[in-house]
Amino acid sequence: MLAQTANEPDPKSGTADRANKRRIQRASDPATKVRIAMISQAIRSGAWAPAVSPGMSLDKRDSADRAAQAGTQKTIEPFARYENLREKGLWLNIPGPADTIDQDKHGIRSALADVGIGYIGWTHNTFADNQLPNAARSSIANQLYLGQNPTFATANFMIVTYDLSRFGVPDGQIVVGAEQQYWTWKRPGPDRVGLNTLAYYQTFFDRKLELKLGYLRNQNEFTGTLFGGISGSNMFALLQAGMSSNPAPTPAVNLKYNLDDRLYNKVSVQRSISPDGPYAQITENPSGLNWSTANAGILFVDELGYKSKAAAGVPDTWLRAGIGFNSSHYKNLADPDQQRESGNNFYYIAADRQLWQSDVEGAPSRGIYGGFSVMGAPPDLNRISRYYELRLYAKGPFDSRPSDLIALVATNTAWSKFAVDAALAKGQLAHRDTMAITGTYTAHLAPGIYASVGLSYIHNPTSVTHTPQTEHALNLLVSTLIFF
């Protein structure tokens, strides 16, 4: 994630040798970061956030182990042919067949690739449970945070692509995706079966300009919320301001201008999700096919970023900053009795940097990373007004486990002062922020199979109000991710 994504076209048209080199590097790379990201996002973001979408978002692939990198061209070639069939235009990389459980058994993928069709599917299953003895268990209907009761969630995806470059469209592609999700606790859901994406993509001017339009999930197009393949930021801070997500895609047109092979500017004109949040959006539009929902307007997003991929002696770096403006009509938390009003907005700033390379020559992306994120939105229109995150993580921490990842993430979520003051005026116990420290270890068990375990301590895991029994939580986090 901290480098130029492999499924995005290189904005500079390199020589044939450079193109071949990139193709070989991709094919030998098992997409570790993507899987780790998908695992960690759900188990951590739901650890305290009251309504986090289960759609996981994904990060780009990490380097393969030494054995894979030492493999011959004969080993690499069988999977290189699928690179053009992976979804394009994302900041993250969904894995290729080399890191799936079925790869190309029975020749099904090969036969489809011959006619320009590619596919990837995955199942993501998460579990959270507060381990403190006074966990204040409740009925599921009255559950206030993820883990208060043992909480299970599953999200299942299928993405199919069709290659239009075979007809002369530069990097052309059609993408169709579906998603099914289920939660034992419905508030972060709800359950649904529906559209994940329906998109058209192509490039212009020798890949200087990228166009993607259709029903998009912009959580995978902007912000890079799964930093370095780890837990990632709490996406709810941006979802509340209208950004579309895996379970809530909306019509959008995205344009990305590559100033060079590292510096870019990306903009989107997107139909906002419901101003009442992801739960209201999915409840009103579970299929994801409706053009709009009640009170939803237009969201404009602009992101400026700098990406530099890890190489021998060159650290992995990703810097980005963005703003968003939403014309949807929101409830005013400062005066709930007045009419809804427009003018919501948000901003975000994030940076990730490789601090040390543990395998400079063999796998330069392995090593220790650090990063931070800051997100903000007006407190009168958003329950989350500020979000801060610090992270430290190690990719390929051991030579014997070159595809694993260890992460330590600290977060602070500041709640709207108007929502807090209103709760205090009613005599309720209320808190102005939520703090969490989360540690996870994610293991790559086999091609296409990942598992993660972690602990997350959360001070005030509920949203705005709490009881003496819900001030603290120590969530056990377990997740699996299987690609096919």
Predicted region positions:
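Surface-exposed coil loops of outer-membrane beta-barrel proteins
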Residues: 140, 181-199, 206-298, 420-424
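Outer-membrane beta-barrel "beta-signal"
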Residues: 470-484
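N-terminal periplasmic/intermembrane-space "pro-region" immediately following the signal or transit peptide
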Residues: 2-126
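Residues on the lipid-exposed face of transmembrane beta-strands in outer-membrane beta-barrel proteins
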Residues: 121, 157-162, 198-202, 253-257, ...
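Surface-exposed loop and membrane-interface regions of Gram-negative outer-membrane beta-barrel proteins
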Residues: 128-154, 166-201, 292, 461-463
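Transmembrane beta-barrel strands of outer-membrane/channel proteins
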Residues: 119-127, 174-180, 211-217, 267-271, ...
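Short loop/turn motifs that connect adjacent beta-strands in outer-membrane beta-barrel proteins
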Residues: 96, 102-119, 131-132, 161-173, ...
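Outer membrane beta-barrel transmembrane domains
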Residues: 276-294, 299, 303-305, 323-341, ...
